[in-house]
Amino acid sequence: MAKEKFVKNKPHVNVGTIGHVDHGKTTLSAAISAVLATKGLAELKDYDNIDNAPEEKERGITIATSHIEYETENRHYAHVDCPGHADYVKNMITGAAQMDGAILVVSAADGPMPQTREHILLSRQVGVHYIVVFLNKQDMVDDAELLELVEMEVRELLSQYDFPGDDTPIIAGSALKALEEAKAGNVGEWGEKVLKLMEEVDKYIPTPQRDTEKTFLMPVEDVFSIAGRGTVVTGRVERGVVQVGDEVEIVGIRDTQKTTVTGVEMFRKELDKGEAGDNVGILLRGTKKEEVERGMVLCKPGSITPHKKFEGEIYVLSKDEGGRHTPFFNGYRPQFYVRTTDVTGSIELPSGVEMVMPGDNVKITVELIAPVALEDGTRFAIREGGRTVGSGVVTKIIE
């Protein structure tokens, strides 16, 4: 019997639950899967099943994450839920679990709490642009005015971090009650609220662009010269499509150069084009081997530019994760591993921050010694002598 093939007839979207500890993120994750399971759109995942999240290693960082999948009438979703606050921080900064949008869970009984704020800020920093809110534990709030007050607070908090607070969909309900109903095999008034939430997620979080639809970019891994044919650069296409005859730019380390693609090869076979995810060799017209090196990128002209100075949000590995055993201070000069190469840079800490301890997350300003192709959302690792000591994401280009 052939293994069932993953049917790609519905658009795929990645989401995750965020919010303060004990506000009900995991219960909501279980409730969504249980309610949709009654309609045959999900496999029932129990709370304990989601809560005992397996630990994964992502670039040496230990992150506990649960993955569940489900469908609505319109879409297929992959949904991540993390048991601990630290796991969320690591997940969002490393990009280990991509999120196209987030479901922010706020307890109606408590209102926004410190981690509510921190997760909203992190979403803003790492480029999760769409948030839908679930006001949980509505069954514990008798006063309609109190519920309205919490909703207003959440909208204000979202607006404070540049999210459209006034237009954000907010659904009130009870994840626990919906879960209990669904386990009894029916969708009652509480289950309907979870369905309403998913309807809003369907409408409000846009379907992401597929990687092949984005502008072409390929990090250079290696460079060869082939007698009589010219220079070949190899790498894995990160996004977009490249075809023979395309004009491309070579960006990073040195001055940007323009050239034309004269051949695309994969496994020694000539191709018409290479696309996102392909490991290819690209033949470049008139480019000398010594003009290209690992760490540069090939890209669609004008789509990405080289930069030396940027702001970033980083997570510093703990000692247990194989990170540093001691804090670092202002002016710390590690290597920044961006895509395929290490570039030395110095770190400036925010005013008022004396030092950064292993296991912390912090906003930093970095100045590299050589320009690298960067944009908002570019991920990087921080290394010392080849050993990863941190992970980060570019939040703002300075120059």
Swiss-Prot record:
Region of interest: G3: 81-84
Source domain of life: Bacteria
Reactions that this protein is recorded to catalyse: GTP + H2O = GDP + phosphate + H(+)
Enzyme class: hydrolase
Gene3D superfamilies: P-loop containing nucleotide triphosphate hydrolases (3.40.50.300), Translation factors (2.40.30.10)
Residues annotated as binding GTP: 19-26, 81-85, 136-139
PROSITE patterns hit by this protein: G_TR_1, G_TR_2
EC numbers on record: 3.6.5.3
Region (G4): 136-139
Alphabetized UniProt keyword annotations: Cytoplasm, Elongation factor, GTP-binding, Hydrolase, Magnesium, Metal-binding, Nucleotide-binding, Protein biosynthesis
Localization, UniProt: Cytoplasm
Region (G1): 19-26
Protein biosynthesis found in the keyword field: yes
Residue span(s) of domain tr-type G: 10-209
GO terms of molecular function: GTP binding; GTPase activity; translation elongation factor activity
UniProt-annotated binding residues for Mg(2+): 26
Primary location recorded for the protein, binned into one broad class: cytoplasm
GO-annotated cellular components: cytosol
PANTHER family linked to this entry: ELONGATION FACTOR TU, MITOCHONDRIAL, ELONGATION FACTOR TU-RELATED
Family designation: Belongs to the TRAFAC class translation factor GTPase superfamily. Classic translation factor GTPase family. EF-Tu/EF-1A subfamily.
NCBIfam families: EF-Tu (TIGR00485), PRK00049.1 (NF000766), PRK12735.1 (NF009372), PRK12736.1 (NF009373), small_GTP (TIGR00231)
Role of this protein: GTP hydrolase that promotes the GTP-dependent binding of aminoacyl-tRNA to the A-site of ribosomes during protein biosynthesis.
Subunit structure, as described in the record: Monomer.
Name this polypeptide is given: Elongation factor Tu
Organismal lineage: Bacteria, Pseudomonadati, Campylobacterota, Epsilonproteobacteria, Campylobacterales
Gene assigned in the entry: tuf
